[in-house]
């Protein structure tokens, strides 16, 4: 079994780390596959595992995922001296932000002790102002309330310091000090000139945020103080110093070689809808598209919207709940994208688009999908088998449910779709052949007179159109050997059989001008 490289990024719902060998082993064993398109790359575990073996093209419609894949596939060249200067800038920015909301920060620290009254902390969190609820009558929040008044969602604030997380997510997804740390880090990253280094630093920050967030395992909604136990859990997370944790993770990334790329090995990364990506990359018989599409109606833009906001850092307009006409509880972006694979009415059609685009180009296709998803496994199999020869592997998994202790059994199916040779654009190819005037006087076969000799130019055209380069042609009744001869001339391997011993001798004579090592002739 192959050993695959792993790297720590996010606590991610769609990670394929547990089935990585089931995905990568058949790809690596197939020497005809040179390029793998990781179409729904997520946190890039598949692409990162394969990059030592194949050319990898990464794509994901979510911007945070695009940044992560750029980082782990292409790395950066970031010296220890440059890193030390970076942390100095971060500390300066953090000190500035601490001064802006010093009263709220001092109050927050008083809760970072044992045996507090959880109701006091509950009130403190509920009184925290934000762009969603800009007013607070808590005097400890006076500075933060003033800061919030300068920020209008959807507009860049006229301030000379960063405060997006402080004004959007304080005491929601993160503590107040943590939001100051995130804003300081993000502002310092923006000042880094090299895009590769920016991507790596953003990935480090996202990884730490994922572990420190006041959530279960994602960012669909933040946890609230409702009891002593939830209060203790939240305070444990909010005591985490995000700057210091980023420094520690950078050490791991540096050990992995991710920060010391002397020459960039370029892996292309895209931030496109799956269909747009398939139209943008070169697909052919040496390409495999790995597709791990969304399984459910709950969309990744909902679960990881905070990370998109971090990467874009654009003070976004926020989504309104159409039923309550108020801001969504999860504080989602207005511009969240929704995949057709997550819509029951459109998911099967999306699969048909995926399969058809890949099959038409003659590319290999691998799909991973679970048995409790929107599209029934049998329907997906039927759809794939219309255009591919399909091998299916079932992998049994156990899933926890969003941080709960309950475990559910799930079957993950891996569809390995091998191109059906010679099926595409058949009508066009037959029309071309019809236009040919058959020529029987084969220069290679003139030395004998065989009654049913095939037109050599028609045979040649058939081989060129339907047999791939370095492919093999088999003629079960080769007769005078026209098919074998033309295949040899065109650089294909050839296998021929004929019950007639005279045909064997005639064909072997005809082939004396060519390399017989390319040809196997059996009676």
Where are these regions (language model features)?
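S-adenosyl-L-methionine
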Residues: 1-37, 45-53, 68, 405, ...
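Conserved Class I SAM-dependent methyltransferase catalytic core
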Residues: 334-389, 393-395
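Conserved acidic residues
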Residues: 34, 286-288, 363, 471
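Conserved phosphoryl-transfer catalytic core
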Residues: 71-162, 168-169, 505-523
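Class I S-adenosyl-L-methionine
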Residues: 377-422
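SAM-dependent nucleic-acid methyltransferase catalytic core
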Residues: 4-5, 16, 20, 144-304, ...
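Mobile active-site "lid"/loop adjacent to the S-adenosyl-L-methionine
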Residues: 296-348
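Conserved S-adenosyl-L-methionine
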Residues: 32-89, 298-315, 453-523
